[in-house]
């Protein structure tokens, strides 16, 4: 059956700021306390969405979350009106204010793990929300992510959206950023590669930075998504590269159809894994980048593998890269050798995503891949699909509500909270989502 990969990109939120909240993510730590530009960040993301949609790649948008998220501050013991809560937390514990104001939901590669209908036992598309247990600021995302996905994939005959796994370290799940699918045409059954960093009883794990994904979580997600057990491989990421800042697998590997583009040191027991994939995936091709050409350190600083590998109708592929790759002579030299070599990659497309990159999120972090048949695509909420009208409406919306300068101190401004709620009220109507945000359900909307 014919099917297409649709990229659902996260729209950057109004409180995008640099707080260094993500230990193990070196870009996040390095840019802590810099001044951010939320308006520019949102526009950089929108430009990528529109350019890819114009190039013929199906593209959609996932909206931001409500931030600052006051209900969690109340859970932490701050009381009074919303304004009083903001004032108290800013004075007594500003780090909590930064955490509940993070715009991290923009990295929707961590929103959920997807199983296309060709891979599932019941023939539905399954989406399991990630609990993002390893980081407090990200662990807040799951309930609203679930509401958003249910509003976008709202046909229960075709889509099953599963709640996140329990919030415990044993079941730490980071979503599609640790998941690859390999195979032939999108509509054919594929091999699902779940990548984890640690498992109970296995001493092979990183020592400097945390391994955010557990094997136990990956196995549970595969069960929830009803993936045919014959179509699943579990593989451990190389703990040494996690300790060098590769906090998700999508920082060191990217797949598309029959191709796995990865670093030579991406996986534990890599040669064994690649042999397994060759045996089980028709036409499988591994493009391994040697450490002698691109070091792990350069991989992390340029986000070479946090790229999108997209298929054209003729079978050729385009690699979507952040600008940092072009600015690094060694990485850019390697990429041009790759273009000249015998493989499906025939074009490099570069985007300026500096605002997101400075927090450790490249092109692949910003998108959730969902393989859909034509019938399934028609069942998706059409208001989220990118086109000229939506692009212009979202740009106008960003111009109206987003600030062009934000520091950690600005997060205490009650006007920022009011602006954010009004903006999301308008956006949820624009995208025909219903009342997906807690403030709307509590009657606190500004519509």
Swiss-Prot record:
Pathway in which the depicted protein is active: Amino-acid degradation; L-arginine degradation via AST pathway; L-glutamate and succinate from L-arginine: step 2/5
GO molecular function ontology, one term from the record: N-succinylarginine dihydrolase activity
Active-site residues (renumbered): 174, 248, 365
GO biological process entries: arginine catabolic process; arginine catabolic process to glutamate; arginine catabolic process to succinate
Induction of its expression: By nitrogen starvation, and arginine. Induced at stationary phase via sigma S.
Sites where the protein binds substrate: 19-28, 110, 137-138, 212, 250, 359
Catalytic activity: N(2)-succinyl-L-arginine + 2 H2O + 2 H(+) = N(2)-succinyl-L-ornithine + 2 NH4(+) + CO2
Superkingdom of the source species: Bacteria
Enzyme superclass (EC): hydrolase
E.C. designation(s): 3.5.3.23
Keywords: Arginine metabolism, Hydrolase, Stress response
Annotated InterPro entries: AstB_sf (IPR037031), SuccinylArg_d-Hdrlase_AstB (IPR007079)
Effect of residue 365 to S: Large decrease in N-succinylarginine dihydrolase activity
Claim: Oxidoreductase is one of the keywords in the record: no
Quaternary structure, from the entry: Homodimer.
Family: Belongs to the succinylarginine dihydrolase family.
Role, per record: Catalyzes the hydrolysis of N(2)-succinylarginine into N(2)-succinylornithine, ammonia and CO(2).
Protein's UniProt name: N-succinylarginine dihydrolase
Organism: Escherichia coli (strain K12)
